[in-house]
């Protein structure tokens, strides 16, 4: 036999003649009148062939011809003349009558084969599928005749195997039952159940049917990452482990001792070594492959845009690799998506979402500790806290603070998550808190994620001086948890009085509360304090003690453990506010006669406008301003251009860390005796730095030296213990009386502005402190730079800045858009509209290339980029693998990190470029030249920050009021100029 096959031409001729002369249709009845019928019942998968094919430039019968092409040839493949004579008699059908087809044709190794796709009864007519077929790719060996001998030998072996199997079954023909080559009709969708049934019928192909030279029956030993070809599976396995960091020996073979790092390699090994060959049919044509890689390459070459990611286990194809990975969880019995409430796991995320929609108890479990809003997953809570922490205290803040009052030593430190978990599991929780959380694990997770760990705050805070009061200690450099803000201004120290060093020793709750009072809480006006000099210290103490007996102590401090430090103290150190718009200033001028009538009415009108950022007024039965000394009542005066509006609560963190030191002494609210001890130079400097003081004592204008703060607020935005009349809590009166003499005798230091070097500002901003960059915009760093700019000329402060109503409304708009189906709250209406589509199922964004539709436009764009355009812009630097989405690349890089190789993360996701843009903005800001006119801007100029729809900062100039204030204080400012136009430019260079 070896000598016979040495002569290639002779062997080829003999084999071809043998195949040609053999009767191929012994089980078929070929009628002269037309038509081919089955003589005996035919099983599904019975094959007929091989029938020789020839190349031609123009086919004789287009119905039997196949389009063929190669690198240098484009033509047709058609059966030879001796075969085509009877093949023409087989009736063919197309789309209209495709259901009648029980026979299909295909080309294997250059030969034509026919195969039944269903059970055919005896006497039934054979009908072939005549729809257009995919072009045949001819390799160079076929064109050159180099492997024609091997193809003929394989075909002969197939015929011998078919004959032997037919003899055993009693047919004695050329048919051979085998696996179904068409698990679904051409162009139809895939059915996994049908495929599994067919695979159970017969999953093995005889060795004679395997032809490794053909693309359809061959196996592609190729790296799917870098597309390198290897001669055997062992070399490919070593390559994947060494070059692409696959886990070694993860998939063992059940029939031998070999192990592989990739499951497709195991499947190929079982097919090659153990003849366990699986079939992967093309959805768009009749081709069937033994290797999913060949099927994928076939789809990309001949069916552009179709799903080209087949599953190695079942053959189902997917449009993306991520969809295939999610599908493979079904075969691996891995259920990565588990419900956090009932611990039920699913293989697909959509099934988990459906489970949560059907079970209300699994939907709302984890609650935000700030606004008490419920979430179903920790991921949703984390996204919510990014928005929630940037705004003011929520409507449920009182409840949270009250719980801390009841258990002042039971809550763990915010920067120690392990202590949080321990305290949650061991300490008894209040009844309200236990009802809010479904499990201790969820509560511990919420407590642990309140704030990231702070390396500089590893010790417990100082013990409180009195029950109900927050601890009072030295200010740390870094901020604490927003839930436990500091009780004094931080970041840079001020004079000793600010740290409590110059005050008297705290021996009573009254003096303790005095330490908590904002230093600008006390009136110190030159024009009005003379009218109140008749009130002595004895009267102050007497009235305060009597009022203390009537009111309980808890009322004064209700909900102030956190708020007294975050809201009341900071508001007391801000400059006096001015109106939000010109219309409000005109209304103030119209209401001046009403305010002059009585001090109570005047205080009520002024305070009602000064606290316009608050939501609701307090009950009317609280004490009025007449019950306490007039020196202590808040009298909000408007000087027509020199006041700053109190910032919204989302800006309070910045003002806590960057206090204006030149206002501190003025905001102490010093009495008349203490004010007289100041030198004339000091008072003139203060008057120059606060333009807008009227020389005549009028009830509607107060000196710029003593801007009064806003009243303290509770968590819900309501006034804690201040009436509409603007009265101060009587506790404040007693506190001032107890400490009045000490304050009067305390030393006063000249105030200076803090000086910050530009490099220090950039370094501080680079470190990523949370109070320097706010989520709604970057107003924090702008205000910081503005404060540094004013240090160059302390006698000429920047013009007043007015905050628009958008920053005020921003505190409440986050509760405005709620879902009527699940109660979820969104900050903007667009977010709510997009969320409602998850309940209604609306998909208003259809794809123009396919029949898919999406509820979100970004998902449609991503679908077009990844599926139809095949864009892969994100590349892994470690293994050169490309991805269509950044999240997929990040997930892929994490796999590298989890293998213990400590690879760095993708540079595209590190945010380096974004931070550099921030630094460029800082440098541009610091290189500007600021004057009062240039900073104030033209009339109506506004500056809007990105990602801040509800909050904006309007820089407007009230020229009339500004010039009026300048003329009022021209006598005191003669040394520095008569008006604001004489101000010199302040240049800040980096």
Curated annotation (Swiss-Prot):
Residues 696-712 have a biased composition (Pro residues). Was named 'hamlet' because of its 'to be or not to be' role in ESOP cells differentiation. One of its GO terms (cellular component) is nucleus. This is Transcription factor hamlet. Residues 164-196, 392-440, 554-633, 667-725, 892-913, 933-990 are annotated as: Disordered. Signal peptide: none annotated. The keyword Metal-binding applies. Keywords: Developmental protein, Differentiation, DNA-binding, Metal-binding, Notch signaling pathway, Nucleus, Repeat, Transcription, Transcription regulation, Zinc, Zinc-finger. It comes from Drosophila melanogaster. A zinc finger (C2H2-type) spans 221-245, 251-274, 280-303, 309-331, 337-359, 366-388, 817-839, 845-868, 874-896. GO terms for molecular function: DNA-binding transcription activator activity, RNA polymerase II-specific; DNA-binding transcription factor activity; histone H3K9 methyltransferase activity; RNA polymerase II cis-regulatory region sequence-specific DNA binding; zinc ion binding. Residues 400-412 have a biased composition (Basic residues). The keyword Lyase does not apply. PROSITE patterns: ZINC_FINGER_C2H2_1, ZINC_FINGER_C2H2_2. Residues 564-597 have a biased composition (Basic and acidic residues). It comes from the Eukaryota. Transcription factor that plays a crucial role in external sensory organ (ESO) that elaborates from a single precursor cell (ESOP cell). Mediates the differentiation of lineage branch that generates the internal 'ES' and 'th' cells (external sensory neuron and thecogen cells, respectively) from the IIIB cell. Its absence leads to re-specification of IIIB daughter cells into external tormagen cells (tr cells), or internal multidendritic neurons (MD cells). One of its role in the development of the ESO lineage is to modulate the activity of Notch and PAX2 signals. Residues 416-427, 683-695, 960-983 have a biased composition (Low complexity). PANTHER family: GASTRULA ZINC FINGER PROTEIN XLCGF49.1-LIKE-RELATED (PTHR16515:SF49), PR DOMAIN ZINC FINGER PROTEIN (PTHR16515). Residues 900-911 have a biased composition (Polar residues). It is found in: Nucleus.
